A protein has these predicted regions:
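Short, solvent-exposed, charged loop/turn and helix-capping segments
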Residues: 51-68
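Short terminal alpha-helical segments
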Residues: 1-50
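Generic structural signal for hydrophobic core residues of well-folded globular domains
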Residues: 20, 38, 53-57, 75, ...
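Alpha-helical rod/repeat scaffolding segments in eukaryotic adaptors/tethers
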Residues: 32-39, 60, 64, 94, ...
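Amphipathic alpha-helical binding modules
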Residues: 73-131
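Intrinsically disordered or highly flexible coil/loop and linker segments, enriched in small
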Residues: 25-29, 62, 121
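Amphipathic alpha-helical interaction segments
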Residues: 48, 69-73
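Residues within HEAT/ARM-like alpha-solenoid scaffolds
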Residues: 44, 66-69, 103
Length: 131
């Protein structure tokens, strides 16, 4: 049973990493705009990507800064979308009216960076224990 869960978690990680590495647009979040415009936005994908942070650190695999940055971008935008009950026009508003979103995004940034910092510290700590 434990082995099946580990294999399932590893599959989630591999899928998440593959999605990120195969889609350079994720870095800038532009693919979210395309998905929203085509009404194909699927929050489950982003939930899996975010879950992969904890799974990767659980299995003592170092998380690259670039991966953390990409996951941060995804989480930031998905949280904005969830907070606004997701309207495709919100993506345009975020770009065209940054002052309107600035305070809200700052709160999200603080929470997300705390999460990322915590995960990075876990990875560093696990790495030292294994050495």
């Amino acid at each position: 049973m434990k082995r099946l869960k580990k294999e399932k978690d590893q599959c989630i990680v591999n899928n998440a990493l593959q999605v990120i590495s195969n889609n350079e647009q994720l870095e800038e979040g532009s693919c979210l705009y395309v998905l929203a415009y085509e009404e194909r936005f699927d929050l489950r994908l982003f939930d899996e990507l975010m879950h992969s942070i904890s799974v990767v650190s659980t299995y003592n695999k170092p998380i690259g800064v670039q991966l953390l940055y990409q996951l941060y971008i995804i989480q930031r935008i998905s949280l904005v979308l969830m907070a606004s009950h997701f309207n495709p026009e919100d993506l345009y508003c975020i770009e065209s009216e940054p002052e309107h979103w600035k305070e809200h995004l700052q709160e999200l940034d603080d929470a997300i960076f705390a999460c990322i910092k915590g995960q990075a510290l876990k990875v560093i700590t696990y790495g030292k224990e294994g050495a």
